[in-house]
């Protein structure tokens, strides 16, 4: 499970938790993870996971991840089961802005008040503006040659 939703209000619909796996022989998440963070047993190596490395404050980031500012979710978007899931019908879950339309310079020039106004109701507050700026600076810098 990558997420959980906790509600403060009653809802008239609940579904039963799914026990088991629908993955079968599918390896889409394993084969397409940009950093190889999804192991064959479908566990996640958090040290390699782009989402963990760009979002979690406790996760140190030493190397650049060119093109990645916050999060990834390639494993989720490539999952055939997730692709078939019904879209939500609740406006409260609609995106409040398009983060893909923002470049690194926008994030670097933003102050805390602007960040709170734009992102205060989004999961981006989890990483915070400081972490997003660090990611923008690191990922804009030329990547150092690998020591292999």
Regions picked out by a protein language model, each given a short descriptive name:
Residues 11-20, 40, 59-60, 82-87:
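Inter-helical turn/loop segments and adjacent helix faces that build the functional surface
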Residues 117-120, 125-143:
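Long, compositionally biased charged/polar accessory segments in the mid-to-C-terminal portions
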Residues 1-32:
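Ferredoxin-type iron-sulfur electron-transfer modules and their immediate structural context
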Residues 28-50, 65-92:
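Iron-sulfur cluster-binding cysteine motifs and their immediate structural context
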Residues 52-53, 79, 83-112:
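Conserved Radical SAM active-site core
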Residues 14-24, 61-72:
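Immediate flanking context of iron-sulfur cluster ligation sites
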Residues 53, 57-70, 101-125:
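Short Fe-S-cluster ligation motifs
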Residues 83, 140-147:
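Alpha-helix capping and inter-helical loop/turn segments
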């Amino acid at each position: 499970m990558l997420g959980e939703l906790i509600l403060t209000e009653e809802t008239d619909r609940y579904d039963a938790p799914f026990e088991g796996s629908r993955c079968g022989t599918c390896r889409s998440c394993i084969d397409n993870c940009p950093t190889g963070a999804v192991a064959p047993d479908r566990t996640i190596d958090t040290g390699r996971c782009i989402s963990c490395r760009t979002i979690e404050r406790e996760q140190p980031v030493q190397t650049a991840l060119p093109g990645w500012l916050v999060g990834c979710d390639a494993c989720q978007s490539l999952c055939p089961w997730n692709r078939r899931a019904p879209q939500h019908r609740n406006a409260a879950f609609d995106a409040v802005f398009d983060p893909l339309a923002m470049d690194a310079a926008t994030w670097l020039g933003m102050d805390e008040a602007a960040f709170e106004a734009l992102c205060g109701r989004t999961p981006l507050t989890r990483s915070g503006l400081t972490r997003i700026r660090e990611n923008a600076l690191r990922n804009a810098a030329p990547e150092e040659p690998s020591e292999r």
